[in-house]
């Protein structure tokens, strides 16, 4: 992993791996992310990323307004773009489940399915977890998924994450019950 600033005196970091780069969100990424999330072209990702929560429609203007906080945020950014061969293909993020107890959860989405099952998500998540441990005062990074997303579970296990909890049959999607999976790494 190589970490460097975007430009001299820049507080924002770029994280370079072998096949992916994690970089801060740019204004020019907003319409790309909007098309991935709300467009008709790349919808396969939503079948695996908490599909039991409906995706509420949003205008591009409202989406851009919601993304502005990520444009202004300094280190450490809460969301970064995953780039592969110069193309923005997804995002990594973190959020505080409970900041007062330093309980942090991370997430990842690769939107176009043509980039799945190539190790890009695993590499991006590894870079992101390393970055979070280096830049935040935390002892653990958590990740929550569901039993309907075996690729996410495999990627987390490859990185040394342990299954810390399994809430059985608490996710209901298309007439089938699934388990909620809590994973973590110290």
Language-model-derived ranges and their functions:
Residues 1-32, 79-186:
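Acyl-donor (CoA/ACP) binding surface of acyl/acetyltransferases
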Residues 40-41, 136:
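Structural motif
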Residues 27-34, 38, 60-64, 68:
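An amphipathic alpha-helix signature
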Residues 8-10, 66-70:
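Short, P/G- and charge-enriched loop/turn segments at secondary-structure junctions
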Residues 42-67:
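Conserved GNAT-fold acetyl-CoA-binding loop/helix
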Residues 70-75, 161:
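Short loop/turn motifs at secondary-structure junctions and domain boundaries
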Residues 39-40, 149:
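Short loop-to-helix capping motifs
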């Amino acid at each position: 992993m190589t970490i460097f600033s975007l430009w001299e005196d820049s507080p924002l970091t770029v994280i370079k791996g072998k096949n992916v780069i994690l970089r801060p969100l740019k204004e020019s990424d907003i319409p790309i992310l909007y098309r991935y999330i709300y467009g008709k072209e790349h919808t396969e990702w939503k079948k695996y990323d908490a599909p039991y929560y409906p995706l509420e429609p949003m205008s591009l203007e409202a989406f851009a307004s919601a993304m502005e906080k990520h444009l202004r945020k300094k280190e450490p950014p809460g969301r970064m773009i995953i780039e592969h061969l110069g193309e923005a293909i997804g995002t990594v993020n973190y959020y505080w489940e409970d900041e007062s107890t330093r309980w942090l959860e991370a997430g990842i989405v690769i939107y176009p399915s043509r980039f799945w099952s190539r190790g890009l998500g695993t590499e991006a998540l590894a870079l992101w977890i390393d970055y979070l441990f280096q830049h935040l005062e935390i002892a653990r990074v958590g990740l929550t998924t569901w039993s309907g997303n075996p690729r996410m579970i495999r990627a987390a296990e490859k990185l040394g994450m342990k299954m810390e909890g399994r809430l059985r049959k608490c996710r209901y999607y298309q007439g089938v019950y699934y388990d909620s999976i809590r994973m973590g790494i110290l």
